[in-house]
């Protein structure tokens, strides 16, 4: 309603980064449910538009370009930690229940990385500074999060090559010209990380 009242356009983006877990039939059912509710959109997978592709599973090459920019800044490093290892270490958790990464692999030497690669493929994390980011959400007010203490170095890419949600949504919002994002409270804790990515990539963030 906010977008329509201001002459904006609604983009239906399908966030199916993990194509195996999110088969296309789920997206089809989603569109059917939205249509049943009387909700319409101007651009999307079934309708087309100027900002295709609308399925994140088809955007790997686009995400790679931004990922390479972060690599060139020296902020990306390989991580060999498993989820079970992080939980076993009793690492602190974020407000959404995720483990705050303690930086276990942040300081690995080239020799240590080469040795660990012999046993398993790494995921890749973005190094974050000890910096507080304050933002105002249109529904939930002003919030402040410290990137290092409240979020920790976060995933950009899984070991199987699938890009992480945080990077994908930032790149997609920018390339689609998204100016306003409405989301649930469960995604509030993602905002500081996304704002940091917008800054690193030189992109204009939307209003939340």
Give names to the regions the model predicted:
Residues 1-90, 94, 185-205:
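N-terminal Rossmann-like or analogous alpha/beta NTP/dinucleotide-binding catalytic cores
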Residues 78, 83-207:
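Active-site cores that bind ATP or allylic diphosphates and position pyrophosphate for catalysis
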């Amino acid at each position: 309603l906010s977008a329509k009242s201001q002459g904006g356009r609604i983009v239906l983006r399908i966030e199916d980064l993990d194509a195996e877990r999110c088969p296309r039939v789920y997206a089809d059912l989603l569109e059917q449910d939205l249509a049943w509710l009387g909700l319409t959109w101007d651009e999307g997978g079934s309708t087309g538009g100027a900002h295709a592709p609308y399925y994140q599973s088809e955007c790997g090459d686009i995400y790679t370009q931004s990922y390479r920019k972060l690599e060139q800044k020296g902020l990306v490093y390989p991580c060999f930690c498993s989820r079970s290892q992080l939980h076993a270490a009793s690492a602190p958790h974020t407000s959404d229940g995720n483990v705050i990464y303690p930086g276990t692999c942040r300081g690995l030497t080239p020799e240590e990385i080469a040795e660990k690669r012999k046993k398993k493929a790494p995921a890749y994390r973005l190094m974050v500074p000890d910096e507080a980011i304050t933002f105002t959400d249109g529904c939930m007010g002003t919030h402040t999060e410290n990137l290092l203490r409240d979020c920790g170095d976060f995933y950009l890419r899984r070991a199987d090559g699938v890009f992480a949600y945080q990077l994908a949504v930032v790149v997609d919002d920018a390339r689609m010209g998204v100016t306003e994002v409405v989301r649930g409270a469960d995604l509030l804790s993602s905002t500081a990380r996304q704002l940091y990515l917008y800054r690193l990539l030189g992109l204009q963030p939307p209003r939340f």
